[in-house]
Amino acid sequence: MPKRKVSADGAAKAEPKRRSARLSAKPAPAKVDAKPKKAAGKDKASDKKVQIKGKRGAKGKQADVADQQTTELPAENGETENQSPASEEEKEAKSD
């Protein structure tokens, strides 16, 4: 491969960087597909409505049950909950 000629001032020019055609080509635009399954989509929407109605009732019941369970659970980290200072005094009075 022949070297580039040195210019009059003696400095060598840098070779231009070349890229392959594959890398320099612009990426293909994304294809936008039309949705031809409109009839199938309508069927799915009607099915979803039926399922949602069924789920709403179940969720409401589950939420009530969950609320009851959380109130009955002891304190976190194994600590006992103190219900009120008055109840502790009553326990001490009974033990005397």
Curated annotation (Swiss-Prot):
The modification N6-acetyllysine is found at residues 13, 26. It is found in: Nucleus; Cytoplasm. GO terms for molecular function: chromatin binding; nucleosomal DNA binding. Phosphorylation favors cytoplasmic localization. Phosphorylation on Ser-20 and Ser-24 weakens binding to nucleosomes and increases the rate of H3 phosphorylation. The modification Phosphothreonine is found at residue 80. InterPro entries: HMGN_fam. GO terms for biological process: chromatin organization; post-embryonic camera-type eye morphogenesis; pyrimidine dimer repair by nucleotide-excision repair; regulation of development, heterochronic; regulation of epithelial cell proliferation; regulation of transcription by RNA polymerase II; response to UV-B; response to UV-C. PROSITE patterns: HMG14_17. It holds the Pfam family HMG14_17. Keywords: Acetylation, ADP-ribosylation, Cytoplasm, DNA-binding, Nucleus, Phosphoprotein. Binds to the inner side of the nucleosomal DNA thus altering the interaction between the DNA and the histone octamer. May be involved in the process which maintains transcribable genes in a unique chromatin conformation. Inhibits the phosphorylation of nucleosomal histones H3 and H2A by RPS6KA5/MSK1 and RPS6KA3/RSK2. This is Non-histone chromosomal protein HMG-14. It comes from Mus musculus (Mouse). The gene is Hmgn1.
